[in-house]
Amino acid sequence: LQIKIMLIGFLIGSSYLIGEYIYKMYVSRHRQINDLIRILEIIRMDLSFGMYTLEEIFDRVGDKDSSVYSRFFKSMSYGLKSDDIGTLDEILTCNIGILNKDTYLASKEVDEVNKLIATLGKSDVESQQRMIDLTIENLKKHTSETKEDITKKGMLYKKLVTFVGIGVCIVLF
């Protein structure tokens, strides 16, 4: 009887923790998109001064930022610094996997960042600032979607997985 009670408690507890983990993934994605918007605003300000190269901007952002994007921007800066890697597109192709692995960003957000960085350095400063502004606006739309996802999907999965755990306990015992 005690083993049954312990198993029931374990199943309900683990199902609750799984639901909580899914909910926190939605919250983390929302937070990471907001961090990315903040980083892009810093890049836009640095570009507007016109005194920094992309390498220096990426290095500064990588140094300032302690979020998941720090490694990506430091790696981009290092790639631009060393001559043997290649063009910006090749460096970006090598490093975009960092965003896919280390963040909860969806492919559409990663594509936004990919397109933006690929176009940086290929035009004048005003065009680059407009591209950054456009990317920020698109990401702000994604933040409203992620906020809805938190309240709808995140809470739904949290409750659903807990009730599935309770249901499994009822069926098994």
Task: Name what the model sees in each region.
Residues 7-18, 145-173:
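Bilayer-spanning, highly hydrophobic alpha-helical transmembrane segments
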Residues 3, 7-81:
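Juxtamembrane/interface alpha-helical elements of multi-pass membrane proteins
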Residues 73-81, 100-101, 134-137, 148-158, ...:
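Short, highly charged low-complexity linear segments
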Residues 42, 98, 138, 142:
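Solvent-exposed, charged/polar functional surfaces in cytosolic regulatory/catalytic domains
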